[in-house]
Design a protein with these regions (language model features):
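Elongated, amphipathic alpha-helical interaction scaffolds
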Residues: 1-211
Length: 211
């Protein structure tokens, strides 16, 4: 599974995680649907879209890009896709672009062409390694940081997150899905292990049974 697919799975299943990144209250998730949309002229899809599902012209729609490899052409592509999307669909909402990086070293700004655009309030660049994680209310941020956690400490963080989920997520179905997602991330980080081995190694199965 590719890194961007993991993030899109997270946003699909737990959209409050995305809004936590932006410092927006979790109840904003009730106003949005996470989806993808095809751009016909270029035969590609925007895989990360948060589209408003309520009639409020002030609500922005969000284009989300996850970039874990240096790409000098990224902003050329992103802005081309954005403006072609605007021309083709003419959405009734203002746009916001959110780009998620593991760290600043991965970004290629191309400041000659894009410096002024990247400084617009419409564009948010997030560097996961710089996110702070307070002791309380930090479950969404910790979940995303698990993706960049070193292999030798990822298992401990996964177990901590599973235990934190027991306390903070009251809905049993949501909690089960959250722990399954933790397992998926760890299997991605430790591809030599099966999901069953990961669950056994980190006692995630035991955590499930004790809920």
């Amino acid at each position: 599974m590719k890194t961007d697919s993991i993030f899109y799975n997270i946003f699909q299943e737990f959209p409050f995680v995305f809004f936590a990144l932006l410092g927006i209250p979790a109840d904003a998730t009730n106003q949005y649907q996470f989806t993808s949309q095809k751009i016909k002229q270029l035969a590609f899809r925007l895989d990360g879209l948060f589209l408003p599902i309520v009639e409020d012209a002030q609500l922005p729609f969000y284009i989300v890009e996850v970039q874990f490899q240096p790409d000098p052409n990224l902003y050329y592509r992103l802005f081309a896709e954005l403006f072609i999307y605007l021309k083709q669909y003419q959405p009734p909402h203002p746009w916001q672009l959110v780009v998620i990086y593991p760290n600043r070293q991965t970004e290629r700004e191309n400041s000659l062409h894009f410096q002024e655009m990247l400084e617009l309030p419409k564009i948010t660049r997030i560097y996961l390694n710089e996110l702070s994680t307070p002791e309380t209310g930090s479950l969404p941020i910790k979940l995303l940081k698990l993706v960049i956690e070193p292999e030798n400490t990822a298992s401990d963080l996964a177990v901590d997150l599973a235990r934190q989920a027991q306390t903070e997520i009251s809905d049993t179905t949501v909690r089960e899905s959250f722990i399954n997602l933790l397992e998926t991330i760890i299997v991605y980080k430790l591809p030599q292990k099966t999901r069953e081995e990961v669950a056994a190694m980190f006692s995630l199965s035991d955590l499930k049974q004790t809920r």
